[in-house]
């Protein structure tokens, strides 16, 4: 299995903001203009919509995957963190790509602020949870792009 360092800094990556009902997905590369939101994947009682995830994976052909690590302010475990780590392990097994975790604290707040700016500029028309999930994934990818050394290996 590839290690975290195996993700080339100039490679295309997919990033994920894992929630209990939706998973925001973004794509990014250091050679491009940062990251952009690309999809929201529904999570059902039996897990994520893997058919939809397979389509996104096939379309973007990433060299690595970046999953948001929902740490608490005091770095304690919580159900959301366990869910994100389980999803990251599934990604690694399914796609045989390097998977890293990056601190996602405040990514949803940052995504909401970006959304508000875009709405004020007339680029967004209404608040949409799906858009925010994917925008939060873009924030996660941008954090990895700006500081890949802060990523951690999947335990």
From Swiss-Prot:
Compartments it resides in: Cytoplasm
MF term (GO), any: nuclease activity
Keyword hit for Nuclease: yes
GO BP term, example: rRNA 5'-end processing
Protein name (database record): Putative pre-16S rRNA nuclease
Class of enzymatic activity (EC top level): hydrolase
GO cellular-component term (any): cytoplasm
Highest taxon of source: Bacteria
General function of this protein: Could be a nuclease involved in processing of the 5'-end of pre-16S rRNA.
Pfam families: RuvX (PF03652)
Family: Belongs to the YqgF nuclease family.
Stored HAMAP family: Nuclease_YqgF (MF_00651)
InterPro entries named among the record's database cross-references: RNaseH-like_sf, YqgF, YqgF/RNaseH-like_dom, YqgF/RNaseH-like_dom_sf
Keywords of this entry: Cytoplasm, Hydrolase, Nuclease, Ribosome biogenesis
EC numbers: 3.1.-.-
